[in-house]
Amino acid sequence: MALIDQVKRKLNITWSDEDTEERVKDIIALAEPIMKRKLGISASASYDFSIPGDENMLFLAYCLYEWNHTTNEFDENYANEIAECRAIHEVAHFVETEGENDEQA
């Protein structure tokens, strides 16, 4: 399912109008770099938040908080999940860069 459709489902949007569609697109565009930073995903990396998993769950939750203008509560409510995802991505990045350093040596 496309990310925009997942977000609409999470937000319980069952109607279709141009203003709502644009707002959802704006929320997704805003959420992508924010969630990459929070989760330790390189800003330059392309990441598909539509793939089921913890990152997808957190992305959709962040969109819900943004929809309701309550993003100030997101970090506190999802701190453990964010930390777990961040640790996984930081280890993956370390292994990736360590491998590059070994090849250069």
Segments (PLM) and residue ranges:
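Conserved short "hinge" loops at termini or chain/domain junctions
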Residues: 1-53, 88-105
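Alpha-helical structural signal
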Residues: 24, 60-61, 78
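Mid-chain, well-packed structural core segment of small domains
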Residues: 40, 47-71
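C-terminal structural segments of small proteins and small subunits
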Residues: 69-87
